[in-house]
From Swiss-Prot:
A zinc finger (PHD-type) spans 363-412. SMART domains: ING (SM01408), PHD (SM00249). Keywords: Acetylation, Chromatin regulator, Growth regulation, Isopeptide bond, Metal-binding, Nucleus, Transcription, Transcription regulation, Ubl conjugation, Zinc, Zinc-finger. Residues 286-296 have a biased composition (Polar residues). Residues 308-323 have a biased composition (Low complexity). This is Inhibitor of growth protein 3. It comes from the Eukaryota.
């Protein structure tokens, strides 16, 4: 898991390279601008003194002015080529970043399916600023969750801590307090329902699908999992700012070092049909599944199908009332639908290619009919149908000096020249 470190090492020299190239580009821009100002002054003087001097002097001055204009034009073309080189440099680093992210996501998904979506959403929630209240929330009485840390009025003027530190400390304190409460309550025995998992069931104020912590492991309670998440956030808070991927990696390492087995079960979102009537049923089914997984001595993970869930719940709760048994047996179809909706692991992610794939709508250039990449050179013929060419396709290793024409335009110009002769 060294993708982040390798990429940071790769772009370590990028700011200095960009600064040097932008400085050179600025110097060339000033040079072109000064040359244009001098040429305008010379042109005005030329027209003022044209009638007073001989035709030979006028032709000589005219040729000199045209020569200086062409030199300024070449400098401007060189400045444009430098800008294209800067763009290609940044574009190569962006493509490399996309490739490394795809590889990292594939490795995470191979070990724990669905974990990348949760970690990415958590990172976005931590980094995104608090949004203003819109009309939907203004009319509804649901309070809008604010993730920004609000210091007390007594210390507001004295403290100047960054906003990201506020968010990390707020989340850390919340996770630690939840973990202490759940560890104090605990689970009395293996046959009792897992009451420590109720804090992570479906939340009515979240429209998005939240990760069901109750199904993460069979031997560890939600308190230990919360403590692991708190340690991950604390490790992330100690890192330097600007490394957003560190939070994702720290969270993954915290779960991995504590030997937590991440499941594939997600809690359903608000928009699913029958949410208000089946939320209690989902809570009961989740508790029965976790209690039956705790009761199994072999330590194997509990299956998410309907048969094993109903058999284990009936065997573990033989002394319970007949109403709960009839509830579980009559809702088998609901369990199947929920399990299908809750598994948010698209097959396209697992089968997606790691290599960068180009957009089919991206324009094609060069004689090879490929997209723009690397260093390219433009044909100075305004009517050229292709216009841009890769260095390797036209046999160039460096930027040409002066005007350059592609092989097709060069051949066409030679044919026209031979016809005129």
């Amino acid at each position: 898991m060294l993708y982040l470190e390798d990429y940071l090492e790769m772009i370590e020299q990028l700011p200095m390279d960009l600064r040097d190239r932008f400085t050179e580009m600025r110097e060339m821009d000033l040079q072109v601008q000064n040359a244009m100002d001098q040429l305008e002054q010379r042109v005005s003087e030329f027209f003022m003194n044209a009638k007073k001097n001989k035709p030979e002097w006028r032709e000589e001055q005219m040729a000199s002015i045209k020569k200086d204009y062409y030199k300024a034009l070449e400098d401007a073309d060189e400045k444009v080529q430098l800008a294209n080189q800067i763009y290609d440099l940044v574009d190569r680093h962006l493509r490399k970043l996309d490739q490394e992210l795809a590889k990292f996501k594939m490795e995470l998904e191979a070990d724990n399916a669905g974990i990348t979506e949760i970690l990415e959403r958590r990172s976005l929630e931590l980094d995104a600023p608090s949004q203003p209240v819109n009309n939907h929330h203004a009319h509804s009485h649901t309070p809008v969750e604010k993730r920004k840390y609000n210091p007390t009025s007594h210390h507001a003027a004295a403290d100047h801590i960054p906003e990201k530190k506020f968010k990390s400390e707020a989340l850390l304190s919340t996770l630690t307090s939840d973990a202490s409460k759940e560890n104090t309550l605990g689970c009395r025995n293996n046959n009792s329902t897992a009451s420590c998992n109720n804090a992570y069931n479906v939340n009515s104020s979240q429209p998005l699908a939240s990760y069901n912590i109750g199904s993460l492991s069979s031997g560890a309670g939600a308190g230990a999992i919360t403590m692991a998440a708190a340690q991950a956030v604390q490790a992330t808070a100690q890192m330097k700012e600007g490394r957003r991927t560190s939070s994702l990696k720290a969270s993954y390492e915290a779960f991995k070092n504590n030997d937590f087995q991440l499941g594939k079960e997600f809690s359903i979102p608000r928009e699913t049909a029958g949410y208000s009537s089946s939320s209690a049923l989902m809570t009961t089914l989740t508790q029965n599944a976790s209690s039956s997984a705790t009761d199994s001595r072999s330590g194997r993970k509990s299956k998410n199908n309907t048969k094993s869930s109903s058999q284990q719940s009936s065997s573990s709760s033989s002394s319970s009332s007949s109403s709960s048994l009839s509830l579980c047996s009559s809702s088998s179809t609901v369990v199947q639908e929920v399990s299908q909706q809750a598994t948010v692991v698209p097959e396209s992610d697992s089968n997606s290619q790691v290599d960068w794939t180009y957009d089919p709508n991206e324009p094609r250039y060069c004689i090879c009919n490929q997209v723009s990449y690397g260093e390219m050179v433009g044909c100075d013929n305004q009517d050229c149908p292709i216009e841009w060419f890769h260095y390797g396709c036209v046999g160039l290793t460096e930027a040409p000096k002066g005007k350059w024409f592609c092989p097709q335009c060069t051949a066409a110009m030679k044919r026209r020249g031979s016809r005129h002769k």
